[in-house]
Amino acid sequence: MLVLGTYGAFKTKGENMRSSKKLLVVAFVAVGTLIGAACGGSDTTSDTTAAATDGCAAPEVNLDATGTETIKIARNNWSASAVEVEIVKQLIEKNLGNPVEIVDIDENAMFAGMSSGDIDASVEVWPSGVVPDEQAFIDDCSVSNMGALGAVGKIGWFVSDYALTQFPQLSSWEGLKDPEVAKAFATAATGDNGRFLGMDPSFSQYDEAIIANLALPFQVQFSGSEAATQAEVSALSAEEKPVLLYYWSPSGAVGKYNLKNIALPAPTVDCAAEGTACDGDYPEDPIFKIASTKLAAKDGKVFNFFQKFALTTDDQLSFLGPVDIDKVDPATAASDWIAANEATWSTWFN
């Protein structure tokens, strides 16, 4: 059964990190375009076979689909996903004719729903948030790895820029060991320990483990959501009160609030496999796409579109600023991106 909800009210990005479930970074295998598909209307077998990936047999694609099947795409609880699914919806509905339904769904349920065919695709999956139970659906070939999106993400620890002026020792992560620094970040709830502002507690995170294993005098407090974190940072910035927090790049908010990444030491363990022993920085995340393997038979043209769909980090930054800073509606930001990038997206329908 799918767990659905209202956008912004659910939890995503790697559930169960707090319960020490091991994370598994997906091995990327480049996904080719459909072999000879849509190049002249041929109905030969080679024209209807998608490129194989992840050790799975290439699915047979239905290029005779009439464009009437509803395509269901997963939307996750962060700004980039909100815009990307709108780009997908607008492009598919205009160019392929299929109605598109955006589904707000927990990532754990998303993989199961995609395996069953109830969800068709997700265009933003962070490798560090894929747990073994989710990877199993890719391994059994019921969920297809559709290749890299193109953007590269980086979760990390960020600090307000004025805090670096207030505490020059924060030029190195070791400055966080200073008890006087920690007190400056403290709240009534953390006592003498500094507050580390977490976000949604279900997001992929090692922060509690990093703090414990580096013996830092900090305590994690969760805001509950990206919006709540932005509101807290905005309030603290207005008074130039220091804040240390979990965030990621690319993000419009990082630029808006002049947040600076604190480079942590390289971990001595594989944090993806030994989360509670993690003692160092987060890895870079080459974001990738997934789709239900059943989508190939449901509508091969849409399946082909998802294989070709790609956005760079710069593409994301171009619409994250308006959405995060100017509060532009994601659908409007998507429409603006489409209007400015026809030379890019038109090739996805060749």
Name each model feature, range by range:
Residues 34-38:
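C-terminal motif of bacterial Sec signal peptides marking the signal peptidase cleavage site
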Residues 39-48:
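Bacterial lipoprotein signal-peptidase II cleavage site
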Residues 53-86, 107-108:
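Extracytoplasmic "Venus flytrap"
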Residues 66-80, 98-103, 193-197, 306:
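Short, well-ordered beta-strand elements
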Residues 85, 103-141, 232-234, 252-257:
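Pocket-flanking alpha-helical
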Residues 113, 119-123, 194-271:
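Ligand-binding pocket segment of bilobal, Venus flytrap-like solute-binding proteins
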Residues 142-196:
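A conserved helix-loop-strand patch within extracytoplasmic ligand-binding domains
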Residues 155-165, 285-298, 321-322:
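A bilobed periplasmic-binding-protein/Venus flytrap-type ligand-binding module shared by bacterial periplasmic
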